[in-house]
Amino acid sequence: MNIMMQAVPPHSLQAGDTILIVGHGSREDSGNQEIRDFTAQWRARRPELRIELCFIEFAPPELNAALLDAARTSQRVLVVPLILNAAGHVKMEIPEAVEQARLAYPHTEILLAPHLSACDPILAILKRRLRKAMNALDMPDPTSTGVVVLGRGSSDRGANGEMAKMARWLLEEGDHELVDLAFTGITWPRLEKVVQRQVLLGMRQVVVLPYYLYTGTLMQRIHRQVEHLRSQYPQVRFFCGEHFGFENEIFELMDQRVADLRAGVPDSRLPCDGCSYREIAHDLGHGHSHAHTHEHAPAHDHAHDHAHDHVHHPHEDQPA
């Protein structure tokens, strides 16, 4: 990204706050359209807010241009990632775009919220999806029904760790003896291997719970994979859930991010905003061989526990 070295004069157009949603973007436009639909629904729920949308890649409006426009026309911009896991895009590209906009419009306050993250509201969605799956199965017996939480996978171990936490929480708050984690790419284990293990352990039914906000190429691939597994294991009943971007908890989480930023709640800002590890990443060639777990102290005094061997793949398609 090219950093603007000369500041733009302060804006003189529209005052007030702008909420800028940042979606990942997908090569499959149906996924981008769902994010647009989410934005429209959030505007309808919160008509007092000025809510705008941008994408990191694959769809307009593009993050950098949208952020500069918001900074030009607002007194304050609240940047809220509509993204589940904090991998390279959340830790690198979004904070860099925010820094550019701050340089260009120093008189505009720009605040960056955390991603949605692994949290109780997301767990509530997973539990509800699992109950729906069990109600649809012929034999809703949790002792013979394996569960697979299926995420997109990342080269960032912190993002994968959040997925592992969600799978563990789902296990501890339910009656299922097997709740496993699988990934569609980048890392392991993959869905096919996890299902193979569950069948060998005697599971007669398998519930696949995609950990995705919106549709796209990877959600389409997941449904094809489950169809293949049905053919491979005709004695096993499979249920594949859907993505969960329009659940009420997602709107409530976005509301909370905005409220926390406005109130200045501690830890309401993304830890990677202003993080020095990204400067080191640039020296290493834009971060293609540095790992970063962001294990922050609870009080977050910006004393980061960094392990700089994070591998960031800049174009891992499909939002998570």
Question: How should each PLM-predicted stretch be described?
Answer:
Residues M1-A320:
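Active-site-proximal alpha-helix that buttresses catalytic centers in soluble enzyme cores
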